[in-house]
């Protein structure tokens, strides 16, 4: 808390270059809590000193990993996401998601959990069916059965989504399956966030490959 209260914003510059369609960001030797390039002139001087030098690749590292679907929304995480994407205040987001609830297109909004209870699982296919005309991403999920089994043909039931121990009176915010007609522009945007987050929860985990390339120019 002390560090937050005493934080002083500072302007700094970053040095980047594109080489063979790849963006490289410079790592400069700096002292802790200090910035290497504190003025535009300093940055330009550095660029001029290395712009005619060759860029030497020093290492290439590839790592495979798994990217999981983001958790379903509780009220706080929805407010954060709406502020990030649409610059909505927390109060504005609450008013919009409350309106969507009153229109019966999303579930109760004032929740602090990102999980669903087990009794929701058998209802998922009907919810997906109700919003299929609005989201083409639903199509691959429609043939899946909510039978709790693992493997092809079954709707996933992940502990990252379903956990009775982490649900009290109300579960995470999800679509109800009612047709989301007659929504305002902002209501549509917030509804889409909720619906797409819900749909993503039933997609397979994404296998990703990250490549880190280190290069140097000059000494």
How would you label these PLM feature ranges?
Residues 1-219:
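Core catalytic DNA strand-manipulation module of type IA topoisomerases
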């Amino acid at each position: 808390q002390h560090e937050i209260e005493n934080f002083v914003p500072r302007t700094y510059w970053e040095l980047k270059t594109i080489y063979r369609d790849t963006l490289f960001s410079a790592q400069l030797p700096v002292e802790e809590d200090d910035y290497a390039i504190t003025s535009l002139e300093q940055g330009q001087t550095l660029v001029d000193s290395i712009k005619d030098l060759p860029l030497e690749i020093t290492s290439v590292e590839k790592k495979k990993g798994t990217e999981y679907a983001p958790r379903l929304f509780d009220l706080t995480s929805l407010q954060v996401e709406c502020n990030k994407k649409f610059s909505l205040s927390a109060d504005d987001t609450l008013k919009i998601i409350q309106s969507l609830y009153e229109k019966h297109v999303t579930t109760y909004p004032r929740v602090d959990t990102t999980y669903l209870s087990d009794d929701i699982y058998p209802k998922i296919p009907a919810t997906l069916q109700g919003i299929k005309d609005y989201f083409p991403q639903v199509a691959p999920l429609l043939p899946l059965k909510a039978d709790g089994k693992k493997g092809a043909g079954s709707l996933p039931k992940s502990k990252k989504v379903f956990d009775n121990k982490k649900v009290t009176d109300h579960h995470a915010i999800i679509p109800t399956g009612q047709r989301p007609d007659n929504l305002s522009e902002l209501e549509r945007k917030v509804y889409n966030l909720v619906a797409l987050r819900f749909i993503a929860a039933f997609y397979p985990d994404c296998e990703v490959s990250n490549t880190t390339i280190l290069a140097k120019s000059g000494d």
